[in-house]
């Protein structure tokens, strides 16, 4: 696992009325600071990759749909520099994923339904000076194969 990445499996409390699950608590120390909460939708087959931040951490949650999430450690001072992690997240595998600054991240929408992401950041978005650096989805250094392997 890439150094500094944190995974929190979510516990659903279900009964005949539906379910309840806690997402983020102030006593968990997942985010150093709350900056912004955002909500986005992506359609089946979409790949949104890669980008990274120099100043902010991200905390991702996918309440609907299914995602293949790919992380790549770019940090020069990291003991896991150059490592890749892959997570399968979404409505069938509910979890939170903390992505530290300096770790490139992206996702592919799996299946035939749209994907919803709700994410929290440690800084508010500044359109005049965005803390967002982009890397092509097919970057050779990262070298990730986004194709589904049929086995």
Swiss-Prot record:
One of its GO terms (molecular function) is dTDP-4-dehydrorhamnose 3,5-epimerase activity. InterPro entries: RmlC-like, RmlC-like_jellyroll, RmlC_Cupin_sf. Pathway: Spore coat biogenesis; spore coat polysaccharide biosynthesis. SUPFAM superfamilies: RmlC-like cupins (SSF51182). One of its GO terms (cellular component) is cytosol. Keywords: NADP, Oxidoreductase. To dTDP-4-dehydrorhamnose reductase. This is Spore coat polysaccharide biosynthesis protein SpsL. It comes from Bacillus subtilis (strain 168). The gene is spsL.
């Amino acid at each position: 696992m890439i150094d500094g990445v944190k995974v929190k499996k979510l516990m659903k409390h279900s009964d005949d009325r539906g379910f309840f699950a806690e997402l983020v608590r102030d006593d968990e120390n997942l985010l150093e600071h709350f900056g912004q909460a955002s909500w986005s939708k992506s359609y089946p087959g979409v790949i949104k990759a890669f980008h990274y931040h120099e100043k902010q951490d991200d905390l991702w949650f996918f309440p609907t749909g299914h995602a293949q999430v790919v992380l790549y450690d770019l940090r020069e001072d990291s003991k896991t520099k150059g490592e890749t992690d892959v997570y399968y997240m979404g409505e069938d595998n509910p979890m939170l994923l903390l992505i530290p600054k300096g770790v490139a991240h992206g996702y592919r929408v799996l299946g035939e339904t749209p994907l919803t992401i709700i994410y929290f950041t440690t800084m508010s978005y500044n359109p005049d000076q965005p803390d967002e650096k982009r890397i092509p989805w097919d970057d050779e250094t990262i070298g990730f194969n986004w194709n589904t392997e049929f086995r």
